[in-house]
Regions:
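Carboxylate-rich, polar loop motifs that coordinate divalent cations or form catalytic acidic clusters
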Residues: 1-116
Length: 116
């Protein structure tokens, strides 16, 4: 191998090493979490959405949970109340442009309008 090739290879690896030495380390990300200890009704969450008021909605195995940033309100099926959600196993939650909260359950689709 010629002397010039050796110098080029040496410079290449030197530059590569310097790049690694001066590259920034990624910022450490710290996650916080909400669990049943903080009021979530069930720890398995299938779907999350946020309404226009800033409330977070969580679809779980134990109904739908609304979190206002401080407290949870839990919406569950009540066989004696025809206006409750269709089933406690809520697989998805979504808000629409009209402010309705749509909840997909094992027994059908429920919706709730916070405006009314």
């Amino acid at each position: 191998m010629s002397k010039l090739k050796k110098i080029v290879i040496y410079l290449f690896f030197l530059c590569l090493g310097m790049h690694s030495a001066f590259s920034e380390t990624p910022e450490q990300i710290t996650f916080s979490y909400i669990s049943i200890n903080e009021g979530l009704s069930q720890s398995t969450v299938f779907s999350i959405d946020q309404d226009k008021r800033g409330n977070m909605w969580f679809a779980t195995y134990d109904g739908v949970n609304k979190f206002d940033g401080y407290d949870f309100t839990i919406y569950q099926h009540d066989a004696s109340d025809p206006h409750s959600i269709a089933n406690d196993i809520a697989r998805t939650v979504m808000t629409d442009s009209q402010g309705r909260i749509w909840i997909g359950t094992r027994d059908g689709l429920s919706w709730y309008n916070e405006e009314k």
